[in-house]
Structure formats: structure tokens, C-alpha cells
């Protein structure tokens, strides 16, 4: 299970890279 913050961090990194 992932934490909401963890998911947000992944999304942030995704948008930062792209």
C-alpha cells in the first residue's frame, strides 16, 4: 500500500521529467 503523499511525489516527479 502506498501513502497519498508517496503517490503525489511520484506524480510530481513524472510531471517534472515530462
Curated annotation (Swiss-Prot):
Substrates-to-products reaction catalysed: D-erythrose 4-phosphate + phosphoenolpyruvate + H2O = 7-phospho-2-dehydro-3-deoxy-D-arabino-heptonate + phosphate
Any coiled-coil regions, as ranges: none
Enzyme class: transferase
Keyword Transferase: yes
Post-translational changes noted in the entry: The N-terminus is blocked.
EC number assigned by the record: 2.5.1.54
The keyword Cell division is annotated on this UniProt entry: no
Keywords, in A-Z order: Amino-acid biosynthesis, Aromatic amino acid biosynthesis, Transferase
Example of a GO biological process term: aromatic amino acid family biosynthetic process
Molecular-function annotations in GO: 3-deoxy-7-phosphoheptulonate synthase activity
Pathway: Metabolic intermediate biosynthesis; chorismate biosynthesis; chorismate from D-erythrose 4-phosphate and phosphoenolpyruvate: step 1/7
Subunit structure: Homodimer.
Family membership: Belongs to the class-II DAHP synthase family.
Protein name as catalogued: Phospho-2-dehydro-3-deoxyheptonate aldolase
Native source species: Streptomyces rimosus
Amino acid at each position: 500500500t502506498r501513502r497519498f503523499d508517496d503517490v503525489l511525489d511520484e506524480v510530481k516527479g513524472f510531471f517534472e521529467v515530462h
